[in-house]
Amino acid sequence: MAKKKERAVNVSGKPRHSLDVNRANDKKGAGGGAGGGGGGRSAATVRRLKMYKMRPLRDRGGKILKHDLQSKELPNTRIEPDRRWFGNTRVVNQKELEFFREELQSRLSNNYNVILKERKLPLSLLQDHQKQARAHLLDTEPFEHAFGPKGKRKRPKLMALDYESLLKKADDSQGAFEDKHATAKLLKEEEEDGLRDLVRHTMFEKGQSKRIWGELYKVIDSSDVVVQVLDARDPMGTRCYHLEKHLKENAKHKHLVFLLNKCDLVPAWATKGWLRTLSKDYPTLAFHASINSSFGKGSLLSVLRQFARLKSDKQAISVGFVGYPNVGKSSVINTLRSKSVCKVAPIPGETKVWQYITLTKRIFLIDCPGVVYQNNDSETDIVLKGVVRVTNLADASEHIGEVLRRVKKEHLKRAYKIEDWVDDNDFLVQLSKTTGKLLRGGEPDLTTTAKMVLHDWQRGKIPFFVPPPQQGEDSPSETAEPVEKSDEEGVSSDRTAAAMKAIAGIISSQQQMNVPCQKEFGVTNEDSEVAEQSE
């Protein structure tokens, strides 16, 4: 009798269930395992199959007690009827709103006032835009008096009753339009005189491209405080009124500060006069950009810290430095950081794009390329303002005549050791022979000599400044009689006292301890003439 074959027992202990994750793939080439070589299922397939078998938990009646793979349902909730949640948080009546509106308009006219909590203030209710202002027609004429059976108006009200009044209104609107567009008005006057330059080299349009203006508007939009850097030698010539108008109309919440850079190139009384004049419009500070020996750094840092403290609701504030080319915007940022973080050069156009600089954890600085606003400046004015690189000028000698007219003769004698000259050509010829700028055959190189003079002008080696419009007691008297040699010591002591008084005024206003000054502005009778008004 044959033995009954017993069923083999799995003694290896390996699982054989199809949903077991630890199942071994013994059959090679069968099935679709993860490695492609086993008959079992992968762990991802096993988890997916288990998910299909999950069911919600129900009671005997079939009501779902607990959903599988879902969060537990919360019971119905009800918000407490408390005044803290449903009541008015801020209530103001019409009289208080009108009073606050008048106070706000009177205070905001002063640029030294700052709104502390702008987000909590309903500015949309306090400022009536001209386009959104109501006409208040029912206050002037009720609806019943204009339409219906009780209407009293027999004919419609027109803009003008006769042609004379219509013509007058058209003239008034035309005059208002011309006043608004002052640049177009100046160009029109030039056309009437017949002295308008129709063709101008592209180098005289530097700083006016769309890319540069785009960089300026990006800096303005990103800044909480805008610092307009001005040249202390000619503040009004390097001032951009278009920028100030843009901030007043479109960005009233941004703050504008004037910074008089290069104050070491002008006498102390002129700096004090310009501070007094410009401070009537915006906060103004005097500054001398230098990493080692600067002036006004403490005052500017103090102002920036005050703005950061006022903007306590923001994590950090951004300060944008804008202005004409070659006024020292990048040098000011390097002075604040006490190291070279921005590229600087004594030529315009070194900064190409805007640049973010970290000053502190809460203050960031933005360097902007120089922007030139289109105005009525001639080519010579553009060159003398430092907008154009002198090396790119084809004929630099044609701009020397204006330099000789703006600078006193004594300053040119002291700078170039030339006693007398007839005109600008004679001046260049003598200077070429003195400095050795000669061509073949001993001919003077007028172009190279003229470029050298313009370089000295832009870098401050030739003393020049525009006096302030209202000169105070510290300014030197222009009508003083010539002094004899025996009174030189008394005059020197008087001028020394006046200069020390002006310096003390600037120090007290800006809380500084030392003032850098140019060596040429001394106290002797010969050197003191530099501090007088330039012709």
Curated annotation (Swiss-Prot):
Mark out the compositionally biased spans (Basic and acidic residues). 17-29
Where are the annotated segments for G4? 261-264
Name the segments for region: G1. 323-330
Q: Name one GO cellular component term.
A: nucleolus
Q: Where is the CP-type G domain?
A: 213-374
Q: Where is this region: Disordered?
A: 1-42, 464-494
Supply the alphabetized keyword list: GTP-binding, Hydrolase, Nucleotide-binding, Nucleus
Please summarize the record's notes on activators and inhibitors of this protein. The GTPase activity is stimulated in the presence of ribosomes, particularly of the 60S subunit.
User: In this record, what's one Pfam family?
Assistant: MMR_HSR1
For this entry, the protein name equals: Nuclear/nucleolar GTPase 2
